Amino acid sequence: MLEVRGIDIAYGAFAVLHKVDIAVGERRIVGLFGHNGAGKSSLLKGIYGMLPVRAGQVTFAGEETTNDRPFQQAARGMRLVPQEGNVFPNLTVEDNLRLGALRLAGEAAVHAARFEDVYGTFPILRERRRARASVLSGGERQMLAISIALMTRPKLLLLDEPSAGLAPILVQRLFEMIRGIRENFGVAVLLVEQNVNEALRIVDEVCVLEEGRIVFSGAATDKDQIVRQLWRLDRRTHCSSGEKP
């Protein structure tokens, strides 16, 4: 599905990713973990064509897509859901979804079926369909952002910290819904997330980024190794800041 091989990304002269390899198979959920500033969001933006890839290769659905623009990636079936700025606040829930469906070819019945698919996954959005996105709760807004992407029938979702700012009970519900999306829509997911404990309940594979480099890649079932890697990063961060680990 998605193959990233040896990519480098920089902001001007400042390199943020170095020789990164990552793969996401069909209908798989891959968790991308690491501290703030490790390069997780930059990796998603590079894959999606929002940041230039200086070296390496991105392949999606059998085609090389390195440095293709976001509209080209979306047309192939890839969608990025950023952490912020992911809905139109002055539009209703239904109008947000309708905009998401603009890329979906077909008759009105096809669009109606997609609405039903989304509302079936996120029932609260059906109840709130006449409400403006600006009055939604944080959890409802994240559900709407993901649903807008789903309206285009994607093959791959790139989710950038969807649980940020949510209460613990909402985090659990959101992750269960993400797992349901994989089952019901057949999509693959590359999930950037700080809430590692909850994310490990739904991901199949894990990659850990440290200072722009992959330091661990393996099955989510290898929790001991994942915890050791993250503990090492925590300890290194505390020591470098002068705090006691």
Can you describe what each PLM-predicted range is?
Residues 56-65, 76, 110-115, 216-218:
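Conserved ABC transporter NBD signature motif
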Residues 172-185:
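Helical segment within the ABC ATPase nucleotide-binding domain
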Residues 151-155:
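A short, proline-enriched helix->beta-strand linker immediately N-terminal to the Walker B motif
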Residues 2-4, 17:
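Conserved structural motif at the start of ABC-family nucleotide-binding domains
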Residues 132-136:
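Conserved ABC ATPase signature
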Residues 33-35:
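The feature captures the beta-strand-to-loop junction immediately N-terminal to the Walker
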Residues 48:
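Helix-to-loop junction immediately C-terminal to a conserved catalytic motif
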Residues 120, 204-245:
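C-terminal boundary and immediately downstream tail of ABC-type ATPase nucleotide-binding domains
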